[in-house]
Amino acid sequence: MRSRRLLVAVGLVASMLLAAVPVAQASNGRASFIVVLDDSVDAPRGVAAEHSQAFGADVTYVYRNALKGYSARIDEAQLGGLRADKRVAYIERDQDVTIDQTTENAASWGLDRIDQRNGLDNSFSYTNTGAGVTAYVIDTGIRTTHGEFGGRAVSGFDAVDGGAADDCHGHGTHVAGTIGGSTYGVAKGVTLVPVRVLDCNGSGSWSGVIAGIDWVTGDHQPGAPAVANMSLGGGASTAVDTAVKNAIADGVTFAVAAGNSSADACRFSPARVPEALTVGATTQTDAKASYSNYGKCLDLFAPGSSITSAWNTSDSDTNTISGTSMATPHVAGVAALLLQGAPTRSPAQVASDLASGATKGAVSDLGRKSAGTPNLLLYTIY
């Protein structure tokens, strides 16, 4: 039976835009790098230890699941020696990921929009709840005690400080609330797992993000229905793209933000990963949000402007914010609804199902720069 739930309007705060900048280089010539090893390497931890001794690499993370490799602070003078090791596939300079915040007043409407082809009717209809599906939230953590989650938010992984993946920023709790909150969520029965890769200031690094993806890949059980949400992004990174691709190959459907630069999404990671569901943002009038990235790397759009969801400051607080960060969890939630009813669908099949079922031609204000952008708006019948 399809349930109907009235939407709650809350007029509050903040829009978030994500960007990436190079990690600062230390004055002694050392900087943070991601060292990706050949797939044939069986023991990346051993190679990392060997490189630490031979080249003075100060290892921060070791990757075993989503890719083989490690991150470390390394003297740039040692990079030539590292690259000469035939077990090294390539080396990337690490990048920081940060969140910029502005304010606005608005109310939530996203759930109302995705369950019908046209307009709004102040309700959200659904059959499935996402029960039995795991949703990994790769973000700032989750306030797992929030009333929106009803005990469905469980312990996860913390790449920032090895803690409990608690959210001291708010962004991750908001994203989780849109995926699976009891009031504001698409999939109201999904299990939510925090994967904390951004700190209390909303800052992190690609090396930490890869550590989170690596943990997700290792935690995911073969054949188990699962989705992952990445409402973050930054400059192009082959290592990040590879980690996401390998996690998808393991059976986890990834929804990733297109980005908030009003630019071609193909310039950014992980938005440019073809196997992922790359999501742009729309406004309440079905216009492309002015900040949303665009282009052929997008798969579809979803509501992203003025979205109300859970917040981290108490077990009942909410916040209203904007961005492709807010559009992406709508897609992750619908993917979870689909997987409840069809748990053996592969990530490629889920992506195809969501694209083919989307409302066609509904998004306006794409503009000439958006040539090649698929005009598809998220729709759920699940």
Report each predicted region and the residues it spans.
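Secretory targeting and sorting signals
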Residues: 1-26
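Inhibitory N-terminal propeptides of secreted protease zymogens
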Residues: 22-104, 226, 345-347
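Protease zymogen maturation seam
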Residues: 26, 49-62, 84-134, 147-148, ...
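Subtilisin-like serine protease catalytic core
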Residues: 26-29, 123-155, 163-208, 221-227, ...
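Structural recognition of the beta-strand scaffold that forms the well-ordered cores
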Residues: 33-36, 71, 90-92, 134-138, ...
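Solvent-exposed loop/turn segments at secondary-structure junctions
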Residues: 39-42, 66-67, 77-79, 95-99, ...
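C-terminal subdomain of the subtilisin-like protease fold in secreted/lumenal serine endopeptidases
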Residues: 60-61, 194, 212-232, 237-243, ...
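Active-site-adjacent substrate-recognition loops and nearby beta-strands
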Residues: 103-106, 121, 125-128, 162, ...
